[in-house]
């Protein structure tokens, strides 16, 4: 075993885990039924991660209160809404999870308060400790009364008791973290109260103290109660967070207060601290995109571990196995929490234990299948794993007649199609025009912050080789040649072509793909990127941060990232701030007029004024057009499908999901 330290037991209170891996809690939208119980998708979703070897499953957020922070119906499981139903559905899940030797904690929330996503509110106003601005709305929150606080505390006791009856091994309180309701009470920036719940740190933590005391009173002193805890908020101001490496005055909880709070919370009776960093006002810390470094919470977890004597859990892009074992060995944490990596691959832990790290499907940090879908009031899923939270409904369909399927294009959509077809028992054959797999994602993976894109390509290459999929490289199939081949089904995954236009003197004009394909060697010291969408912004960030270029973005719309394929807010808000932070000159409401020998002439769309800016290289990042030529030429085929960017230029999530859907029903 390569990582034995990660497979030793550890206890939270008197509950022993079989290894050092926990499933980090993630919003369980779509996993509850109308009575507040776990639906079949939720039961299958958590059980699959236990089957995959995870020692402790921590559910996503559930509620116990259903009267104070009112919502139109339970959008997440609720342990008091219909107690008998909750116990029945919960017990079905806990019994299945225990069959795999895993433990399970129910994460219980005190409420969202000012950070409630508007689609969850319905007609009800957000609540908070004080009349403060909400995260998303231009309104003022309603301050909770003391009686309402007491009612929420009492509901925790009842809800935890129902969880214990349902077979849960413990609970985790949500949370003195990320700026949720209990955290809003704990942070003076949000809490302006003058009663016993405001003022001193002890008073601001009173809500959290009363919750653990109520649960211990109701469920017994030995019933474990963990706490999700952010020792630092990373808040610059209302709705404005700090970037990595940025100097700023912390308006939320700073580390000094975080360490003091940790000691107090343990003295109140909490049995473990599940550490992260950030808040909804700095969402890219709480839900780190690919622009954040791996293991970004480690130094904060280590600081907490040095002042408490209970187990410390640490999440935050901990899907580097060597980093994880080092964290346990060096006292950074006791337990490694994996959230999105377990969405991407529920068998992560078992594969790691068996030394099959190349088999682990990587999370790419896009957050479009998980946080992005939750924000849109959909359900938690995964961009690279279409079966996530749909394990039963999207199981591989059996094959009754083996088919030979020709796949034109070895990009991500083509690879996913071949993978699913081969697993089901069909005979896929890939024809790829270049000498490698990955399609456009290969160039997209050039920047240092997109390493996981390349990791996904490597995983597909490894997986297709194991499955014995036939691949023809450097073979550009034409319609004429296709008509001479024998096959049952044709899949066209020929991608998309970059849009271009002439700027007059085009000698120094290239596309974003050209720049990435040559690792920036064809880009001069001064570069102008035309287009402020995700491609243009990531290109500018790479050119400045990684290559030290001087970059200007020219964007016709009023802001960066105004038109894109869907992007999770944590990703888009961080990227929008990183671009100028690393020195890019952003020119919105501006258009390119012409390229000259000395640079690029641009025009202000509001004033009409023109100016010339330095440009050794002009890079077009103005979108893509699906390449449907081959698909259109093959319409006489009995069974032909267009997938990926060939169908519609979108993102990895759409490419993988469309490919899975088509391949699973051939």
Go through the PLM ranges and name each one:
Residues 1-408, 412, 416-428, 436, ...:
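Flavin-dependent oxidoreductase catalytic cores
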Residues 399, 403-431, 472-484, 493-566, ...:
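Rossmann-like dinucleotide/flavin-binding elements
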Residues 458-497, 593-599:
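Feature captures the FAD/FMN-dependent oxidoreductase FAD-binding
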């Amino acid at each position: 075993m390569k990582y034995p330290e990660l497979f030793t037991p550890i206890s939270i209170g008197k509950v022993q885990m079989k290894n050092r891996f926990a499933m980090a809690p993630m919003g369980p939208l779509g996993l509850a039924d109308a009575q507040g119980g776990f639906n079949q998708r939720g039961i299958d979703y958590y059980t699959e991660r236990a089957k995959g070897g995870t020692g402790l499953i921590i559910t996503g957020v559930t509620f116990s209160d259903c009267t104070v922070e009112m919502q139109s119906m339970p959008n997440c499981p609720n342990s008091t809404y219909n107690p008998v139903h909750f116990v029945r559905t919960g017990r079905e899940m806990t019994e299945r999870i225990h069959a795999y030797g895993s433990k399970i904690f129910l994460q219980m929330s005190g409420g969202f308060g000012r950070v409630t996503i508007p689609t969850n509110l319905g007609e009800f106003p957000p609540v908070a400790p004080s009349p403060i601005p909400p995260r998303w709305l231009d309104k003022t929150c309603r301050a909770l009364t003391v009686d309402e606080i007491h009612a929420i505390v009492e509901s925790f006791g009842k809800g935890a008791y129902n969880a214990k009856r349902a077979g849960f091994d413990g609970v985790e309180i949500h949370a003195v973290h990320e700026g949720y309701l209990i955290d809003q009470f704990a942070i003076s920036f949000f809490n302006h109260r003058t009663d016993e719940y405001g003022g001193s740190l002890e008073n601001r933590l009173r809500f959290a103290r009363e919750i653990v005391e109520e649960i211990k009173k109701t469920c017994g002193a030995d019933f474990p109660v963990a706490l999700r805890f952010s020792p630092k908020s990373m808040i610059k101001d209302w709705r404005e967070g700090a970037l990595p490496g940025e100097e700023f005055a912390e308006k939320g909880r700073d580390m000094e207060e975080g360490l003091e709070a940790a000691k107090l919370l343990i003295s109140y009776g909490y049995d473990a601290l599940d550490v992260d960093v950030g808040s909804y006002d700095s969402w890219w810390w709480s839900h780190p995109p690919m622009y954040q470094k791996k293991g970004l919470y480690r130094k904060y977890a280590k600081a907490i571990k040095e002042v408490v004597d209970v187990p410390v859990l640490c999440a935050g892009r901990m899907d580097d196995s060597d980093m994880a074992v080092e964290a346990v060995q060096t006292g950074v944490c006791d337990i490694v929490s994996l959230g999105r990596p377990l969405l991407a691959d529920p068998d992560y832990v078992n594969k790691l234990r068996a030394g099959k790290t190349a088999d682990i499907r990587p999370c790419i940090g896009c957050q479009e299948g998980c946080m992005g879908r939750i924000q849109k009031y959909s359900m938690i899923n995964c961009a690279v794993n279409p079966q996530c939270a749909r394990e039963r409904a999207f199981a591989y369909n059996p094959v009754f007649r083996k088919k030979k399927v020709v796949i034109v294009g070895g990009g991500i959509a083509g690879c996913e199609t071949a993978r699913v077809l081969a697993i089901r028992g069909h005979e896929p054959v890939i024809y790829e025009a270049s000498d490698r797999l990955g399609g456009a994602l290969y160039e997209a993976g050039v920047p240092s912050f997109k390493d996981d894109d390349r990791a996904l390509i490597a995983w597909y290459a490894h997986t297709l080789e194991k499955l014995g999929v036939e691949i023809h490289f450097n073979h550009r199939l034409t319609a004429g040649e296709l008509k001479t081949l024998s096959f049952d089904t044709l899949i066209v995954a020929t991608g998309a072509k970059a849009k271009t236009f002439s700027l007059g003197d085009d000698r120094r004009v290239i596309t974003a793909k050209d720049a990435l394909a040559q690792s920036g060697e064809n880009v001069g010291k001064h570069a102008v990127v035309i287009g402020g969408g995700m491609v243009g912004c990531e290109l500018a960030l790479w050119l400045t941060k990684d290559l030290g270029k001087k970059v200007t973005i020219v964007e016709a719309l009023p802001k960066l990232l105004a038109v894109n394929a869907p992007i999770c807010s944590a990703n888009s808000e961080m990227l929008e701030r990183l671009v100028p932070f690393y020195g890019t000159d952003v020119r919105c409401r501006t258009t390119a007029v012409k390229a000259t020998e000395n640079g690029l002439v641009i025009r202000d769309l509001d004033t009409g004024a023109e100016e010339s800016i330095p440009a050794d290289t002009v890079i077009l990042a103005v979108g893509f057009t699906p390449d449907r030529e081959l698909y259109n030429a093959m319409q006489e085929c009995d069974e032909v499908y267009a997938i990926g960017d060939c169908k519609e230029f979108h993102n990895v999530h759409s490419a993988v999901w469309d490919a899975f859907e088509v391949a699973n029903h051939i």
